[in-house]
């Protein structure tokens, strides 16, 4: 899993908004297309070689690169079809932005809470999180390895909803938007909440994402505390590849 961008809310210098490239030896999926992530994507895979795009929700920092990608696919690369999985609200927002249908090239499939899709050899399961708009956390599994992604959420959701058999996760990328003193003020997580949530989900590795600029060190220390994750915590740094 390669981090294309992990900035919360707005792009930071050198760090686009949310975007991840999830790959197996035979499959490549772009997970969330936040502002600025198309350029980094092309450093790792050609747009024509993508098997699908998965979008967690309609907030701009997670999806608004797609109108640019639509134009590039139609008018530059001449790509006829790219499968896209996302919420109905995301599709409607993007249709309004482009002023018309998304297809071609985006062959859109609406997904919602409880949906499952298979892309190549990677399975994707979706669970609606605690966020003001329909937002889907993601469980991606291939070859016996499991990756979890919180997208945006508050505390009234848990990774166990993606893992009913309690098998755990090899890697979780979890948002940690809020400073500790703002706990509960928005439907986002503090680093302590993220750490505790991922410990309860039996995550073997945790990487924090969706943070504001310059707070990463403090957030990691909060998440590593005994009452949180209780072990080493990483950050989703742009350009870094996690092997799951």
Show the residue positions of the predicted features.
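Short beta-strand scaffold segments in enzyme catalytic cores
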Residues: 19-22, 136-140, 242
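Short active-site oxyanion
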Residues: 26-29, 80-83, 146-147, 204-205
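Active-site-proximal loop/helix segment associated with metal-binding centers of metalloenzymes
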Residues: 11-15, 115-180
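Pre-active-site segment of Zn-dependent metallo-hydrolases
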Residues: 9-58, 64-74, 155-164
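Metallo-beta-lactamase
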Residues: 79-135, 142-143
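Cap/insert and terminal regions of metallo-dependent hydrolase folds
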Residues: 156-243
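Active-site neighborhood of phospho(di)ester-bond hydrolases with catalytic His/Asp-centered motifs
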Residues: 30-34, 51-61, 87, 148-153, ...
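Metal-dependent catalytic neighborhoods of phosphoester/phosphodiester hydrolases
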Residues: 65-73, 96, 216-225
């Amino acid at each position: 899993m390669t981090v294309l961008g992990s900035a919360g809310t707005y792009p930071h210098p050198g760090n686009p908004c949310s975007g991840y490239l999830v790959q197996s030896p035979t499959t490549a999926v772009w997970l969330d297309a936040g502002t600025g992530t198309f350029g980094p994507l092309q450093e790792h895979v050609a747009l024509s070689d993508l098997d699908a795009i998965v979008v967690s929700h309609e907030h701009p920092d997670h999806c608004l690169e797609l109108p640019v990608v639509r134009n590039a696919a139609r008018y530059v690369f001449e790509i006829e079809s790219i499968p896209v999985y996302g919420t109905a609200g995301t599709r409607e927002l993007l249709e309004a932005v482009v002023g018309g249908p998304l297809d071609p090239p985006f062959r859109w499939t609406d997904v919602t809470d409880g949906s499952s899709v298979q892309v190549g050899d990677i399975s994707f399961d979706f669970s609606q999180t605690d966020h003001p708009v329909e937002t889907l956390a993601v469980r991606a599994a291939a070859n016996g390895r499991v990756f979890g992604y919180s997208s945006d959420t508050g505390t009234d959701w848990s990774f166990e909803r993606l893992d009913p058999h309690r098998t755990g996760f090899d890697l979780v990328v979890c948002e940690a938007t809020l400073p500790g003193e703002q706990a509960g003020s928005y439907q986002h997580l503090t680093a302590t909440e993220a750490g505790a949530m991922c410990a309860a989900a039996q995550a073997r590795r945790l990487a924090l994402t969706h943070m504001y600029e310059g707070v990463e060190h403090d957030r990691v220390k909060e998440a590593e505390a005994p009452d949180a994750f209780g072990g080493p915590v990483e950050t989703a740094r742009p350009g870094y590849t996690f092997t799951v």
